[in-house]
């Protein structure tokens, strides 16, 4: 394991929120973070700019907001291997408002604008998206399927294995919780999902996992569910 941003000893007292990144850990082809905003940076490190990939977004939220001016991050297309500090430090200013270029819900659309070939086919498992919302689009996503929970755990490996191109799998732990932080699924469901996902590892180019503690009822709940998944995919310490 490579700690790109080491986990603070007082992590339970930290806030992730919209644009705080408290830790980022790297295993072979797997990245673990507290804030999903860093997923885009991980893809920039791992993926071939010229190659085509499929995309699987497993999340309680669609994360499809766009809108940051392209010129603020366009340079990443020719220089994808910037440091995580450069990536998270990118800012823009508009109408007297100053904000971060990459936040927890806009990274997908912005990376897609840089490398549309990384999103040749998109699978979602997200209760809040049916199709790419027109008011969010920078360019449309080719969403071929939005899987329900009864399909996901037992079929995720089938979908990943049966596409021609390898997958970006983008998992948020909050998928397993409701909007009040209540766990929706049993440990057996979560472990079965993770085991099936792991069985398709040879067809996964990169797996990004976000804990999103504020959406999971707190750090303890997020870490516990992450621990179930980590053990099944072989990255538990």
Predicted regions and their residues:
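Catalytic cores of soluble, metal-dependent hydrolases
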Residues: 1-54, 68, 81-237
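Short, solvent-exposed beta-strand-terminating loops
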Residues: 52, 56-78
